[in-house]
Amino acid sequence: MTRREWLAMMSTAPFVRRVAADRAERVAQIVAAFENQGIHRTGSDVDRASAEWLAAGVRDAGLTPSLEPFPLSRVDPIDAAFTVRGRRISGVPLFDAAFTGAAGIEGRFGLLGAEAELALAESPPNAAAAGALGDARRTSRYKAIVCITRGGRPGLCPSNADAFLKPFGPPVLQVSSEEGGFLEESARQGAAVHLVARVERKPIQAVNVTARLAGADGSLPPLVVMTPRSGWWTCASERGGGIACWLELMRELKTGPLARDVVFVASSGHELGHLGINAFVDRRPGIVSRSAGWMHFGANIGAAQDPGNTVQASDDLFEKMLADAMTAAGLAVTRRVPRGTVPGGEAEVVHRGGGRYVSVIGRNALFHNLADRGPESIDPRVISSFGDVFVRVARSIASRNL
């Protein structure tokens, strides 16, 4: 797809739906529309409008959508910045750490491990609770921490707030890797600094989008298909491929008989400790272990920048189903997660609940990056091929005795 074609789609209203005959073209349209909606943080106005848009896509695929609410104490950053040597650097607070008041925190700056009041650390996306940074947060040695985010490309790449409901440690302000050299020099100098991570909280209702496709025997354990739909930025390649495959699977499964029901959920709350999928499970006691299986369309499916594919599965049979289907579609399995390992993403709730699951998570140089947007971020043909893979796996699980 050319940039001109992409921009032509992006110039349309964010929630207009256009149905193309070719799946790759439909995929590109879906991802462009999703990106064009704005920043997809859980519980935001964009998140709610995107849920309505996705529900319309479910109806277009021939199913009846539901919007299932769950409670959220939404964090709205009001002032998040770090001032040092006359420069003010904006950032994003870590959402599962403490915050500051309006006055912020002042003190001497130093490298992590040094004698200082505010420390400088660094972390790749989603590793803020691990390593030296995680240790520093747990010991509360410092009044506050500045974290240089190290993604696959330069920029601000926040970590998810896995402990959103049980925050810990001092305030942490995440900043772009492009500020790294200046901040490291300032820390070595022991500069006087000021950090503010002021937020407001607002009680709201976020929503999951769900649907159910009836099979021949509703008494059989269902297949559950899940994909997250929220994130820190516009998330074109992070979330777009999974959402497109989720909709395409509905469209394909609607055309043929199935032995059992298929339940679909696109969950919000991904970046906040998977709040949405946990709410979905809580509304359905026992669904994790009583289901025939779960399919998880994780992050970065069909991402074009430094791509790769990680397979996660509960058992050998499910892994073989997915790996064989990927091989048949010409898609490489870059990495297989060892059996028994706690999987990444929403598949974690199934693993911990003793359910059966199969999952794909992609690699992506733009993961959690503000620059995750535009036609160069995705490969629609690869996403379309994953659509073939997921149809094959879903039909296998939904049609056999398990």
Segment roles from a protein language model:
Residues 87, 91, 96-109, 158-237, ...:
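Soluble metallo-hydrolase cores and metallopeptidase-like ectodomains found primarily
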Residues 32-131:
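Noncatalytic luminal/extracellular "stalk/propeptide" segments of secretory-pathway proteins
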Residues 3-21:
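N-terminal export signals
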Residues 251, 366-402:
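His/Asp/Glu-rich mid-to-C-terminal helical/loop segments that flank catalytic regions of hydrolases
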Residues 218, 257-258, 267-365:
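Metal-dependent peptidase/peptidase-like ectodomains
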Residues 19-20, 37-45, 124, 168-170, ...:
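Second-shell loop/turn segments in exported
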Residues 19-45, 61, 70, 81, ...:
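N-terminal capping segment at the start of a domain
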Residues 23-46, 54-62, 83, 121-126, ...:
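Catalytic-core environment of secreted peptidases
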